[in-house]
Amino acid sequence: MENYRSRHNELTKKIDSEANLTNWQDWKWQLRNSIQKISTFETLTGIRFDAEERKILEQTIEKFPLSITPYYLSLIETNDYKNDPIYLQSFADPRELIVQDWEQADPLSEDEDSPVPGITHRYPDRVLFHISNVCSMYCRHCTRKRKVGDIDFIPAKDQVQQGLDYIRATPKVRDVLLSGGDPFMLSDEYLDWILTELRKIEHVEVIRIGSRMPVVLPYRITDELVAVLKKHHPVWINTHFNHPRELTTSSRKALAKLADAGIPLGNQSVLLAGVNDCPRLMKSLVQKLVYNRVRPYYLYQCDLSEGLSHFRTPVGKGIEIMESLIGHTSGFSVPTYVIDAPGGGGKIPVMPNYLLSWSPHKVILRNFEGVITTYQEPENYDDPGCDGDCDKCTLQLKFDDAHEYNSVGIWKLLSNWDETYSLTPENNERMERREGAADGMGQD
């Protein structure tokens, strides 16, 4: 801690000779003094780039802007910066200019699933609500590089109102995830207004906020902000720690403020080559998170966004990490490893296989140690065979309006109230031949 305090003092004076640690801990001062130029980065860190390196770095930040908070900059180990996980996540890399054929600006088709500006509606009962295009730091692995830093603004109330109107007019939406950019870039007053408007919508049960502020600018988690959030429970917060070194004294204090206010905390890590692609490191991270009352939620496979190929690991590395966690640490410390499907397919869990085989009588399983065991299936199970008619159900679900739910995908095939028996991909040649033959038979 003393090492960081000394570094904070040193950086504060380099940035502003009249400033002190009180200024340093002011989140607005941090934003005003964010590092956006290579020359400023060199001055503050002592790291020097030669002319050729500087030229290509300038080209990189011209396409993907640079912005690092002084706080996050202070965590960089300058003696080994090329291998430093803080540096790799925050500073420009010329490899970002390399765009592979399979990479896309919007690989998750968030814009295509946007019924009104600011809303992405992909899953039946929840929406993503973009309320900011601004971040305190531009993470180099960001899946929304097409937005963040390109059009730098916080939407006006009339723009946000379009999203609120859509949510209000869509009764199926029970869960709203506020995202961006970073929602905590908004003023307390503006955020309070948005939360108040959402709480007026009767069918909105849960509000979630995705923010990396506890990681890159923990001073933003002020008592005033926490007081605003407490007014609107249930509010959940997901943050984005990728490496154990990000859990500093300051970040832990920020997390404690939120947890003490009764706000459930989750964490979404991204698997990044050269940053956290190590089973021991990931185990350390999830255990430290749980110790600080943060539930590891997702471990994301790096998306197919443009310029991220140097960050991507094989999926096998993620499986290896999951093998090292499941059974080897507490169950609530283990995140779900997911691939966010290109084209807007949503998050797909990708986990080690523990179900080896099964028959009508037995299931063959293996555990984390490699022990193979059997589980005896029940002999007299009376399957109620759900037909979707909850009024006749004996399982006490009448109050839950479950009959209004629509089955999709594999669940649709398993359901007893839908006559669908197969799902066919688009552009299936066999189906097209069938249709062509049927059309031909109808002609004389």
Give the positions of each predicted feature.
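Canonical Radical SAM [4Fe-4S] cluster-binding loop centered on the CxxxCxxC motif
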Residues: 121-158, 209
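Flexible, acidic/Gly-rich N-terminal and inter-domain linker regions that tether
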Residues: 1-121
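Conserved AdoMet/S-adenosylmethionine-binding subsite of the radical SAM
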Residues: 161-171, 184-329
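Short, charged beta->alpha transition segments
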Residues: 114-117, 127-130, 161-166
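C-terminal accessory regions of radical SAM enzymes
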Residues: 322-422
